[in-house]
Amino acid sequence: MPRWYLLLLALAGAQRLQEMAVSRRHERQVEGRRAASRSFPLMVGVHVALFTLPPLEVAGLQRRSRAPVLWISLLGAATALRLWSIRSLGRSWNVRAVVPSDLRPVEVGPYRWIRHPNYLAVVVEFLALPVAGGAWLSALLLSALNAIVLLDRIRDEERLLREVPGYKEAFGRKARFIPGIF
């Protein structure tokens, strides 16, 4: 397995761990309602698998990466979108879908155009990170599992967000992931 791929996985994993620390800090700072927690353990499991299955596939099946620069660039763009989303939400962002009681609709950054730019970024990462190393099967399996978990999570999260004053007016006509399409 290429060392650069292990380094890429390590960097992406370290970033996820750092985001968990930020999320915990944000959760301690706010009072709010939490989306149903049933999806969170599944989400954690799928994310752990994102960092374990691809290297096993690459090593076990002796996969070779095709166009790694393209996939790493796509991963970089998705990561930039995710970080922009997190920064735009500020202290409201967390991984457990806790909706602060004083939340107002956030319409800055990528939220000007879509409701869930962070989840869009994660969807792209679930494709790009495995494929960058040549793990096509992992990308397909993990993307499917991630989609199932995200659909449940988004449904629960939007149920809480609809109770936020001004949310329906701000986001009712915005697409979830792709402006004007979906």
Give a label for each model feature:
Residues 37-67:
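Long, highly hydrophobic alpha-helical transmembrane signal-anchor segments
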Residues 9-23:
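N-terminal signal-anchor/start-transfer transmembrane helix
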Residues 21-38, 63-182:
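Cytosolic-biased juxtamembrane loops and peripheral soluble domains of multi-pass membrane proteins
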Residues 1-4:
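Feature marks short, highly hydrophobic, charge-poor N-terminal signal-anchor/signal peptide-like helices
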Residues 8-11, 46, 74, 141:
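Physicochemical signature of membrane-embedded alpha-helices that form the seven-helix bundle of GPCRs
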